[in-house]
Amino acid sequence: LTPEGTFLDDMIVYRMAPIHFLLVVNAGNLAKDYAWVSEQVKATGDAVAIDSSSRYALIAIQGPASREVLQPLTGVELADIAPFWFSHGEVANARATVARTGYTGEDGYEIFIPPNMADRVWQAILESGRSADVVPAGLGARDTLRLEASMRLYGNDIDESTTVLEAGLGWIIG
């Protein structure tokens, strides 16, 4: 949030280690968000911001069958990952961070993998999900689900002129 209580963006922050954080931002705002974060950490004098976006591909599997489809592909015990938490391991023999997050309002997982492994993991998920009728879904489907779940999208539903209260998200202020 800005000092005025409006939105800079909508992001998820993962604490990977005591002094190592991974920020997952709206891809369309990457440059703006990176500039803002860099400014904030520079002001502290004891932190560094690194744009590591090219080191990750992200694949999301969402919905009631997500655990059933993903579990055979990983040694990570998916049931043990609490919502908005993550675990490190492998998915389809690719080094991965598996987070129990998503942008659909459904239970599901986001898988962070090296970009050169994305096709392998994607194909493995589709194969594992065949019996559960898993099919790829695009942004239109995601937008329908996020709207039904009252999840806001920066640039569509919220922007730098929208306050938290106007967006109906007063619960995020602590």
Give a label for each model feature.
Residues I12:
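Glycine-rich, Trp-frequent "lid" loop and neighboring beta-strands that shape
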Residues L8-D9, K32:
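Short active-site-adjacent helix-start/loop capping segments
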Residues M16-G174:
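Conserved, structured C-terminal
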Residues L1, T6-L8, G140:
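Acidic, proline/glycine-enriched N-terminal capping motif
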